[in-house]
């Protein structure tokens, strides 16, 4: 059985005080939770602080981005080896905000995926469609294209131990969310698409849902067979709301 993962993406939020307080509250809220992996991705400047605050807990450290280069004259970038050195494990790539604001292509994101695998880190590959693409019935075609950038260059084996986050762009930060049935249909498509190349890998890959997951809708989403946790945005900045989501994932997979 797949082990669900709930990951908090803090985006461009934080302060030294907030990092200490939020992690302390998360540790308290999640101290007895079992059966669900948990990770947080603070801004890069707070990774070292977060690492120390998480010490001895079951909460893993993640990051929000990585560069394709390992070293050199690339001002402002952070390499996979640096993230590994600091203790980060789960690295978000392909987030719609990176694709939109930084014009990151599927091919560029696939390179990031490969670099992370090479150094032993876990890619959290975000894929998903815009509202216009959704309304045009292109959801599956868009997700397939984004997956194929990795499948066609690195093969299905690259998804062993990796994480995929399906994030319908029209549902991010909008308060809208796909219904559990809608989300399940896309998650099943993603798993089936990988299974065309390797059924065993497809069966074990974690596929999170990442479209406005909150403490109100999480439990119903997690009852779906192909939804393995969540990539959480705004709700991850509140320890109590994030804990409800984690507990819902753990409970759903025990049922």
UniProtKB/Swiss-Prot annotation:
BP GO terms, sorted: gluconeogenesis; glyceraldehyde-3-phosphate biosynthetic process; glycerol catabolic process; glycolytic process
Keywords assigned: Cytoplasm, Gluconeogenesis, Glycolysis, Isomerase
Protein name: Triosephosphate isomerase
Subcellular location: Cytoplasm
Single GO molecular function: triose-phosphate isomerase activity
Summary of the function given for this chain in its UniProt record: Involved in the gluconeogenesis. Catalyzes stereospecifically the conversion of dihydroxyacetone phosphate (DHAP) to D-glyceraldehyde-3-phosphate (G3P).
Main location: cytoplasm
Annotated coiled-coil segments of the chain: none
Organism lineage string: Bacteria, Pseudomonadati, Pseudomonadota, Gammaproteobacteria, Enterobacterales
Family (UniProt): Belongs to the triosephosphate isomerase family.
Alphabetical list of HAMAP family matching this protein: TIM_B
């Amino acid at each position: 059985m797949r082990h669900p993962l709930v990951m908090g993406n803090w985006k461009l939020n934080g302060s030294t005080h907030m990092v200490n307080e939020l992690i302390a509250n998360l540790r308290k809220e999640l101290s007895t939770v079992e059966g669900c992996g948990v990770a947080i991705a603070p801004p890069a400047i707070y990774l070292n602080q977060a690492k120390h605050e998480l010490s001895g807990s079951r909460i893993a450290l993640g990051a929000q981005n990585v560069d394709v280069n390992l070293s050199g004259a690339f001002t402002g970038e952070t390499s996979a080896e640096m993230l590994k050195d600091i203790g980060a494990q789960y690295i978000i790539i392909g987030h719609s905000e990176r694709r939109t604001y930084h014009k990151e292509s599927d091919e560029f994101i696939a390179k990031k995926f490969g670099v992370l695998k090479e150094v032993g880190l876990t890619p959290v590959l975000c894929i998903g469609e815009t509202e216009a693409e959704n309304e045009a019935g292109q959801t599956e075609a868009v997700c397939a294209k984004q997956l194929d950038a990795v499948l066609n260059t690195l093969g299905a084996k690259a998804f062993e131990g990796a994480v995929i986050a399906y994030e319908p762009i029209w549902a991010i930060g909008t308060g809208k969310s796909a219904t559990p049935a809608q989300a399940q249909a896309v998650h099943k498509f993603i798993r089936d698409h990988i299974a065309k190349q390797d059924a065993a890998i497809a069966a074990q890959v974690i596929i999170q849902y990442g479209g406005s997951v909150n403490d109100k809708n999480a439990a119903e989403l997690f009852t779906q067979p192909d939804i393995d946790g969540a990539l959480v945005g705004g709700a991850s900045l509140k320890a109590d709301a994030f804990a409800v989501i984690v507990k819902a994932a753990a409970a759903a997979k025990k049922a």
